[in-house]
Amino acid sequence: MIVFDRLWQTMKHKNISTYQLRERCGIDSKTIRRLRANDNIETKTLNKLCTALHCGIDEIMEFVDDTAE
């Protein structure tokens, strides 16, 4: 499963609020809710996030194996 915990850590480290992120990326509150819920996100949204935060994809998301026995 893909999780976005690193996004919130990166935002905190860079002192960027959710509102500022929305303004920089041009994303809506629905997209923020989807990120918080680790729901599907379009690749162009991921691109906007990386561009706005000046970071790599590994700083906003990670793969967590949820098939552990």
Question: Where is each model-derived feature located?
Answer:
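A short, Lys/Arg-rich alpha-helix, primarily the initiator
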Residues: 1-20
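Short alpha-helical DNA-recognition segment
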Residues: 15-33
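DNA major-groove recognition helix of helix-turn-helix
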Residues: 25, 36, 64
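Amphipathic, hydrophobic secondary-structure cores in small proteins
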Residues: 31-40, 47
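Hydrophobic micro-packing sites on short alpha-helices
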Residues: 48-50, 60-61
